[in-house]
């Protein structure tokens, strides 16, 4: 069925066919809006979404028109990025990620023993004690020494150091080892030796204490020994020795404790170690207890402002209830050049320097720097002068009387 739409001169759009059922739109109510629309184009806006109903809604498309009629075509291709969520709020199937169903561990990897991949709190509570891992704590400093086992004098091996040296042919192996044992207070032990020997002196394991000397070329099978430091009554020494096993040219094996020289027939390589005996290490670690001197806590002092505000205190001893106390500096001493006595010098307290009433009653002592009877001498001189004048006057009177 062919459908056409026409525009009348009055601006009313005429729709034929099924479009007559569609209600009038804004374009029909406002004819002036259609002046911008091409006369050959019919624009039909989408109506509001109809109420859901069981009957399907027919959709028609007008050929030659730019927009479809009511309803949406799900097969129509749209431009732009597709929406992640559908209008109903569900996730777009394109954005769904395939979920993998993991295979249970029990079916993929068989467990053996008490080992498990996951360790939850509930599982840790039921685990035996031997499977619980404990955190390791690193303690700085030397650990506390443990007492030796019964039958052992002390533990050895503290600060163990290895040494290696080579003895040339014609040299004594024993003389090369002894200097190491004499250095410091370290103990040494011979671990191994390889080479050949030309001369060796061994001790006899008898009560006579004889020695046997072997000359030739012998291979060293083993060389061992130790030298431990000892101290007896303040005298330090060494205790120990070495033993050796040798093989002769015909395959004979002999050996024993060294009782003399051990001359090398060729290069002999010796490996030994030095260490500190445990009881010596303990003695070195013991330190004198630190003596802390006890000091009396300082007494709190008043601030300088309070010290200035406190009134000064004085101790006054009255003499004759009127004069203040006099502090003598030194006792009476005769003057070095004669002529009197040096009287003690009086010092007046500072509190009485501005007291007029006290000063009136206080008679300072004079410092004697000569004859203390100077006042009397001056009086006698004045009296002599006055007497001389009297004599002169009397002489004049007599002369006048004689002249008269």
Curated annotation (Swiss-Prot):
The keyword Disulfide bond does not apply. GO terms for molecular function: minor groove of adenine-thymine-rich DNA binding. Signal peptide: none annotated. SUPFAM superfamilies: AF0104/ALDC/Ptd012-like. Residues 45-55 have a biased composition (Pro residues). InterPro entries: AHL, PPC_dom. Residues 157-299 form the PPC domain. A motif (Bipartite nuclear localization signal) lies at residues 76-84. Pfam families: PCC (PF03479). It is found in: Nucleus. Residues 40-112, 365-404 are annotated as: Disordered. Residues 382-394 have a biased composition (Acidic residues). Keywords: DNA-binding, Nucleus, Transcription, Transcription regulation. Residues 56-70, 98-112 have a biased composition (Low complexity). GO terms for cellular component: nucleus. Residues 76-88 bind DNA. Transcription factor that specifically binds AT-rich DNA sequences related to the nuclear matrix attachment regions (MARs). The PPC domain mediates interactions between AHL proteins. This is AT-hook motif nuclear-localized protein 6. It comes from Arabidopsis thaliana (Mouse-ear cress).
């Amino acid at each position: 069925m062919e459908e056409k739409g026409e525009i009348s001169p009055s601006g009313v759009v005429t729709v034929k066919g099924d479009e007559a059922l569609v209600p009038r739109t804004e374009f029909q109510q406002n004819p002036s809006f259609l002046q911008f629309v091409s006369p050959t184009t019919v624009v039909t806006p989408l109506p509001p979404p109809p109420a859901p109903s069981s009957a399907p809604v027919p959709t028609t498309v007008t050929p030659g028109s730019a927009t479809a009629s009511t309803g949406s075509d799900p097969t129509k291709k749209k431009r732009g990025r597709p929406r992640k969520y559908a209008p109903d709020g569900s996730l777009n199937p394109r954005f769904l990620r395939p979920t993998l169903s993991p295979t249970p561990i029990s079916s993929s990897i068989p467990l053996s023993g008490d080992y498990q991949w996951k360790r939850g709190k509930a599982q840790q509570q039921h685990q035996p004690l031997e499977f619980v891992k404990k955190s390791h704590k690193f303690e700085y400093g030397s650990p506390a020494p443990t007492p030796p086992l019964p039958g052992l004098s002390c533990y050895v091996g503290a600060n163990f150091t290895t040494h290696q040296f080579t003895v040339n042919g014609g040299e004594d192996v024993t003389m090369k080892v002894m200097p190491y044992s004499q250095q410091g207070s370290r103990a040494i032990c011979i671990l191994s030796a390889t080479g050949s020997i030309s001369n060796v002196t061994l001790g006899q394991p008898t009560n006579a204490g004889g020695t046997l000397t072997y000359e030739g070329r012998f291979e060293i099978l083993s060389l061992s020994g130790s030298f431990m430091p000892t101290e007896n009554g303040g005298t330090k020494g060494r205790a120990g020795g070495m033993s050796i096993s040798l093989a002769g040219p015909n395959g004979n094996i002999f050996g024993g404790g060294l009782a003399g020289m051990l001359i090398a027939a060729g290069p002999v390589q010796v490996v030994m170690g030095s260490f500190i005996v445990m009881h010596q290490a303990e003695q070195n670690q013991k330190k004198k207890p630190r003596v802390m001197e006890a000091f009396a806590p300082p007494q709190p002092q008043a601030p300088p402002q309070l010290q200035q505000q406190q009134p000064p205190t004085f101790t006054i001893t009255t003499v004759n209830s009127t004069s203040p106390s006099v502090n003598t500096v030194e006792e009476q001493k005769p003057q070095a050049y004669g002529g009197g006595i040096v009287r003690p010098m009086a010092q007046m307290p500072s509190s009485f320097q501005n007291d007029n009433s006290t000063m009136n009653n206080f008679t300072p002592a004079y410092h004697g720097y000569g004859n203390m009877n100077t006042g009397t001498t001056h009086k006698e001189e004045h009296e002599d002068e006055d007497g001389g004048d009297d004599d002169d006057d009397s002489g004049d009177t007599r002369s006048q009387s004689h002249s008269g």
